[in-house]
Amino acid sequence: MAGSPCLKLIEFAGEPIHVEFRSNLRARRGKLDERGAEVHAASFLHRRLIILDQELLRDKRDCERILAHEIFHFVWWKAPAVRKKYGSLIRQEFVAGTPGEMGWSADWRKQALHPNDVRNNSRRFRDYVCESFCDSCACLLLEISRHHEITLPPSARKTRRHFFEANLAGRRLKI
């Protein structure tokens, strides 16, 4: 998604977010749990903490992408108007049958959706929209246009880029 340098004008405002690296991250039911599924990262909004898997230190670009994704969870949490607008955009994509996503985190959630989830604005749909926002923001901010997890068609990427330029670029985003 090259061509979105104005997104780099984003300024984050808020208390510091602490970042830790740990080995063998696993999560279950929204908590880190050694019996859970492997994850790359976890965010704890109220504690202002992001935990990244140590393995990410082997791949600088993936580490940056996943850290940016996690930071945008804090933006999502503090931006109800953007949440509502982005949810409408994603609902339109879903109704149009737009395939793919900007990252694995959103993609597997999208594939698990049922039409009733979208119609009823279910928790499953809201979680998907959040992950889609964070994956998309991370790729736009870092100008990542090619990655094996990016499967969203170019036309939908362009629409999202315009959305982010209109709603986030040049703004001071609360985290």
Task: Describe each region flagged by the PLM.
Residues 18, 40, 46, 69, ...:
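Histidine (H) residue identity feature
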Residues 1-60:
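Auxiliary, metal-adjacent structural segments of Zn-dependent hydrolase domains
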Residues 4-6, 13, 34, 84-175:
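Metalloprotease/metallohydrolase-associated module, dominated by Zn2+-dependent proteases
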